[in-house]
Amino acid sequence: MIQSPTSFLIVLILLWCKLVLSCFREFIIALQQLIQVLLQIINSNLQPRLTLCHSLD
């Protein structure tokens, strides 16, 4: 009798962990995309400044 609730609890915990991991993976992917976009913006902002500095030399 004791076994079934504990096994049910274990299954519940495993499912919850799976859910958390999948959400975490989605979050990481979204974060990577955001970082890439930010890097592109920074690069596009730096490019004119770098050319400006070189033209001043």
Swiss-Prot record:
This is Non-structural protein 3a. Involved in resistance to IFN. Keywords: Host-virus interaction, Inhibition of host innate immune response by virus, Interferon antiviral system evasion, Signal, Viral immunoevasion. It comes from Avian infectious bronchitis virus (strain M41). InterPro entries: IBV_3A (IPR005214). The lineage of its organism: Viruses, Riboviria, Orthornavirae, Pisuviricota, Pisoniviricetes. Disulfide bonds: none annotated. One of its GO terms (biological process) is symbiont-mediated suppression of host innate immune response. Residues 1-22 form the signal peptide.
